[in-house]
Amino acid sequence: MPDAVQAPYPAYRPEPNMQTITIAPPKRSWFSLLSWAVVLAVLVVSWQGAEMAPLTLIKDGGNMATFAADFFPPDFSQWQDYLTEMAVTLQIAVWGTALAVVLSIPFGLMSAENLVPWWVYQPVRRLMDACRAINEMVFAMLFVVAVGLGPFAGVLACWRCLSTPPACSPSCFPKRWKRLSPARWKAFAPPVPTSSKRSSTACCHR
């Protein structure tokens, strides 16, 4: 039996009673025009403060190519040292990630408004906002001053950097734990002895 030939879809034809609706362009209010004027004024004023020099970049842009050319050809004469330092870098990343994940869990729990009272999650959230507002280089310098220049300072700096993005950030966990019911956390509570239940029931009856 030959396969049935499927007929092509008919071309779309608008019905005669359909009306075309024309959307009027948005009106420019004085407030929007004033806002754009303020933005342009801020850009103009900030030009000198930021020392914008595009002509210097175009003129001396060849220095970047000269500097980048010094990277080639690479020298692998000390490849054993390179492998050793690569292993240390991976170990720093492992411990930095582990610290970021482990420390994010309690901070995330203390930031969920459906699990803790407001006087707990509000200060914790503000503390995390302050940590995210401070640049990573400031924390890196503090860690170097505290523990010295070495792998441990790199672990602490890696932990600080990994705590910023949403992947391991404590601010990511409250958004997920808000959908949880506090009744689920009762499973972690210790069981109440049967004798205490009976004594409390007897006291109530009395």
From Swiss-Prot:
Keywords: Cell inner membrane, Cell membrane, Membrane, Phosphonate transport, Transmembrane, Transmembrane helix, Transport. The keyword Transmembrane applies. Coiled coil: none annotated. InterPro entries: MetI-like, MetI-like_sf. It is found in: Cell inner membrane. GO terms for biological process: organic phosphonate transport; transmembrane transport. One of its GO terms (cellular component) is plasma membrane. It is a multi-pass membrane protein. The chain crosses the membrane at residues 30-50, 92-112, 137-157. N-terminal fragment of the PhnE protein, part of a phosphonate usage operon that is cryptic in K12 strains. Growth of K12 strains on phosphonate can be observed when it is used as the sole phosphorus source after a 60 hour lag period, suggesting the operon is activated. An intact PhnE in strain B is (AC A0A140NFA3). Part of the binding-protein-dependent transport system for phosphonates; probably responsible for the translocation of the substrate across the membrane. If the reading frame is restored, the complex is composed of two ATP-binding proteins (PhnC), two transmembrane proteins (PhnE) and a solute-binding protein (PhnD). This is Putative cryptic phosphonate transport system permease protein PhnE1. It comes from Escherichia coli (strain K12).
